[in-house]
Amino acid sequence: MANIEKKNHNDLQEKLITVNRVSKTVKGGRIFSFTALTVVGNGDGKVGFGYGKAREVPAAIQKAMEQARRNMITIPLVNKTLQHSLKGSHTGSNVFMKPASDGTGIIAGGAMRAVLEVAGIHNVLAKTYGSTNPINVVRATMNGLVNMKSPEMIAAKRNKRIKDILG
């Protein structure tokens, strides 16, 4: 059920990663509800994810999209790829992402691919280790992207010039 829906809203790309039917067992039977996992990005370094729950599918998707728009982060990109190799983890999922040269494309699987596409990353090599649960993979990917540092940030932290950092 990966990447079912893609549309634009205020220059944001929205992707639906997964919709899941869950049930609660009560005395009279089962109560079904739905969960939706979505990612939103502007294609230029801003990305966010949302997880919505509701009794109907459209309501769950709408809640997830709104949450994704509220929880957006900015990541520093260079030439539509990552600044450096990075790792991210969340519960049982571990992800490894590595910058790639022009023309490589997004080499990543499932939920991680959707996050990287809407973030505006065009060339990257990525691998998921451990659990491939879409929610955990998206959270691990976001954790990795949050920890990415640009040369400007490193130079400011070390009180050095950028050219000293880059060599």
UniProtKB/Swiss-Prot annotation:
Decide whether keyword DNA repair is in the record.
Answer: no
Q: Which InterPro entries match?
A: Ribosomal_Su5_D2-typ_SF (IPR020568), Ribosomal_uS5 (IPR000851), Ribosomal_uS5_bac-type (IPR005712), Ribosomal_uS5_C (IPR005324), Ribosomal_uS5_N (IPR013810), Ribosomal_uS5_N_CS (IPR018192), Ribsml_uS5_D2-typ_fold_subgr (IPR014721)
- Give one Pfam family: Ribosomal_S5_C
**GO cellular component entries:** small ribosomal subunit
GO BP annotations, alphabetical order: translation
Which UniProt key words apply to this protein?
Answer: Ribonucleoprotein, Ribosomal protein, RNA-binding, rRNA-binding
Source domain of life is: Bacteria
> What residue stretches are annotated with the S5 DRBM domain?
12-75
Signal peptide, first to last residue: none
GO MF term (any one): structural constituent of ribosome
Summarize the subunit comment.
Answer: Part of the 30S ribosomal subunit. Contacts proteins S4 and S8.
Comment block on domains: The N-terminal domain interacts with the head of the 30S subunit; the C-terminal domain interacts with the body and contacts protein S4. The interaction surface between S4 and S5 is involved in control of translational fidelity.
Q: HAMAP family, per this entry?
A: Ribosomal_uS5_B (MF_01307_B)
Give the family per the record. Answer: Belongs to the universal ribosomal protein uS5 family.
What NCBIfam families does its record include? rpsE_bact
Its annotated function is as follows: With S4 and S12 plays an important role in translational accuracy. Located at the back of the 30S subunit body where it stabilizes the conformation of the head with respect to the body.
Name this polypeptide is given: Small ribosomal subunit protein uS5
UniProt source species: Buchnera aphidicola subsp. Acyrthosiphon pisum (strain APS) (Acyrthosiphon pisum symbiotic bacterium)
Q: Which gene specifies this protein's sequence?
A: rpsE
